Amino acid sequence: MAAATLLRATPRFSGLCASPTPFLQGRLRPLKAPASPFLCRGLAVEAKKTYVRDKPHVNVGTIGHVDHGKTTLTAAITKILAEGGGAKFKKYEEIDNAPEERARGITINAAHVEYSTAARHYAHTDCPGHADYVKNMITGTAPLDGCILVVAANDGPMPQTREHLLLAKQIGVEHVVVYVNKADAVQDSEMVELVELEIRELLTEFGYKGEETPVIVGSALCALEQRDPELGVKSVQKLLDAVDTYIPVPTRDLEKPFLLPVESVYSIPGRGTVVTGTLERGILKKGDECELLGHNKNIRTVVTGIEMFHKSLERAEAGDNLGALVRGLKREDLRRGLVMVKPGSIQPHQKVEAQVYILSKEEGGRHKPFVSHFMPVMFSLTWDMACRVILPPGKELAMPGEDLKLSLILRQPMILEKGQRFTLRDGNKTIGTGLVTDVPAMTEEDKNIKWS
C-alpha cells in the first residue's frame, strides 16, 4: 500500500494529461470532440484582443456527483466576478451547451470558462458527473492544478463523488477545496455538519489532507438568484478566497520542447483547422513547426495562430488552455488523442514497463485477480488505447490491492515516456493507476501478440 500512496502522491508529470479546451463557439464544427466553449471565435476573423499575462494562471475545475450543482456553481462564480469585471457571466445553459446535455439536464463533456480574481487568472473546467461519461471526465480533470469538489448537503457523498476523487488523485491533482452545495434545502444544521465530517473522512481515505481541506457551505442557486446573501454570494466569495489561498500556483516547465495533447479538432470556415488542448510543457509560438503523433499518424505542419479565451497569443506557455490554427490540414486528418510536439523531440512507443497499483474491491476496483495478457484500456494524456498486461516471470496472478511492476503492450504506438502517469480501466471500472518507469523496444514475441 505504501507504493500505492507513492503513485497517488507523485506530482503530476509535466508532459501529461491535457483537457478539453474551451475555445470554439458559433460557427465552428467539432470533430468527435467534447463541447469546448472557450477557445476562439476570433480565429475566424482577426483577433481584436491580445491576452495579457499579468497574473499567475491556474487551471481549476468542479468535480462531483451528477446533479449536485457543479454547473450551477460555475455559473454563479462567473456572475459574481462579472460584477467586478473579472469574468463574463456565463448562464447555466451556456455552459451545458450541447443539445444532449440540455435535453438530459446533465453535463456530458467537460466545459470551460475563464475568470480572474484579484490575485489570479483561472481556466475553469466544469467536469461531467454522470457515470456514463467518466471517460470525458478523465480528460476534464487531466490538466487541473486543483479541484473544487461539489457535494449536495441533502445527499452527502455519492458514487461519482468517490470516483471523481479517485480519478483526480490518480492523475496528480493534489489540492481540493470543498463546496457543500444546496444548504438552503437542508433545515437541520447537524445534517450539514455530518455531511462535512463524511467528506473529510472521504478525502483522507483518498490520500488528501481531510482535516486541513477548506470546506465552504452555501447555495450556488441562491448566489445565482441573488437571495440569502450568507448562503449565496458570500459563500461563493469565501470559496474563491479558499481557492486563491489553498491551491498553489504550480511550477511550469518552460524549458523542455513543447507538448500539447490534442483534446478537440475544429474547422473554421475561411481559415482552416484548429486543435485545442492544454499545453503541458514548453513554449509554443506562432510560426513554430510541429508534428502531430499517435494513432498511427505522423503529420508535420506549422502553427499559424494561437488563441486563449478569444484573445490572441504570440506565444503560449505550459498550463495555457489554447487553440492552435494549423496550416494545410483538414479536420478529417486529425483526431483527439494526437499529441502536438516539436519535430524530432519525442516518438510514439508501443511497449512500456511501469509501476502499477491494482485497486482493491473496496477502492472500486476489480473483485478478482487477473493473469498475463489481460486486456484493459490505458488512459493517458487525451488518448485511450487497448493494451495487453504482461506479468513478471514467475508471477501468475495480479491481485486487487497489489502494487507491482508490469509490462504493457499497446495495440498501437502512442506518446509514452518515463514518468508519465496513466489509468487502467476495464469496462466501467477504474482498475489501476501507474507510472511509466521505462520504454523498452518491442521483441518479436511482443509483435506477435494477438488482439482479437
Swiss-Prot record:
Residues 64-71 are annotated as: G1. It comes from Rattus norvegicus. GO terms for cellular component: mitochondrial nucleoid; mitochondrion; synapse. The gene is Tufm. The modification Phosphoserine is found at residue 312. Pfam families: GTP_EFTU, GTP_EFTU_D2, GTP_EFTU_D3. This is Elongation factor Tu, mitochondrial. Residues 219-221 are annotated as: G5. GTP hydrolase that promotes the GTP-dependent binding of aminoacyl-tRNA to the A-site of ribosomes during protein biosynthesis. Plays a role in the regulation of autophagy and innate immunity. Recruits ATG5-ATG12 and NLRX1 at mitochondria and serves as a checkpoint of the RIGI-MAVS pathway. In turn, inhibits RLR-mediated type I interferon while promoting autophagy. The modification Phosphothreonine is found at residue 278. InterPro entries: EF-Tu_GTP-bd, EF-Tu_GTPase, EFTu-like_2, EFTU_2, G_TR_CS, P-loop_NTPase, T_Tr_GTP-bd_dom, Transl_B-barrel_sf. Transmembrane segments: none annotated. It is an enzyme of class 3 (hydrolase). Belongs to the TRAFAC class translation factor GTPase superfamily. Classic translation factor GTPase family. EF-Tu/EF-1A subfamily. Residues 105-109 are annotated as: G2. It comes from the Eukaryota. Residues 181-184 are annotated as: G4. Mg(2+) binds at residue 71.
